[in-house]
Structures are given as structure tokens and as C-alpha cells.
Amino acid sequence: RDPANSLLSLAYTLLAKECESALLVAGLDPYVGYLHEVRYGRPSLALDLMEEFRSVLADSVVLSLLNNRRVTLEDFDDSEGFPRLRKEAWPKFLRAWEERLNERVQHPLLRKRLAYREILLAQARILVKHLLGELPRYEPFAVR
């Protein structure tokens, strides 16, 4: 493993938790998915929802941090055999993560500007409407 993959793993973990929270608020069980295999303790539906946002949230935050050298090799400790973000570097990562989640973009279906965190919840609610038959199909979120 390398530092970039370590950051991606961290970002994916945070994104999965954000998706799980959005699904719970929308009244859905995050453990019953349709793309990811349902397994005990695995939030399959959260992982399903996460797929729409993986590149636009997690990947983009990590690439930005690395490309702009806001996080460097010196920010990692590999004394345990794999690169771990040092305690002092966590605020840089979390600040970038929160900035991205709070960034407002146009939601194509709702036709209004929302923060990405709000879009996660909106997508969960759109999924509810689809499952209840109020929408003929589920439209995944895509940045245009």
C-alpha cells in the first residue's frame, strides 16, 4: 500500500458513513443493498449509494490534496508496515473533506443548488420515492 491508497481508503470510509447517515435519515435500512452483496455487518445500501459519489467526493479530495501538495509523504508514518496519516495531518485532510461536502452544486433533478452533503440525503429520498413507486426509475446523481 502507498500513501495515496491510504488516503483513498480513509475518504471511502468517511463517504460510506455519510451515505449510511443519509439513508437512515431518509428511513432506509443501510444494510439491505441492491448492487453490493448483503452480508452481516456490511452497509450494502450505503455502499451502493456511495458509488455515485466516489469520484466526485472521495477521489477528488484526495487528488486535490496530493496534487496541490497540501498532504505530502512527510504527513505519513509507516512504522506499522503501512502508511498512516500522522495525527498532525488529520486537520488538513478533514478540512478538505468538509469543504468538499459543503460545496454547493446544481442538482440536475431537483434543479437547485445544494451542498454535496444535502445531495446525499436528496438521493436517499429520491430512492425512497422510487421504491414506493412515486418515481418510475432512480436517477443516479451526476455532475454536469
PLM region spans:
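N-terminal intrinsically disordered, cationic/polar leader segments
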Residues: 1-144
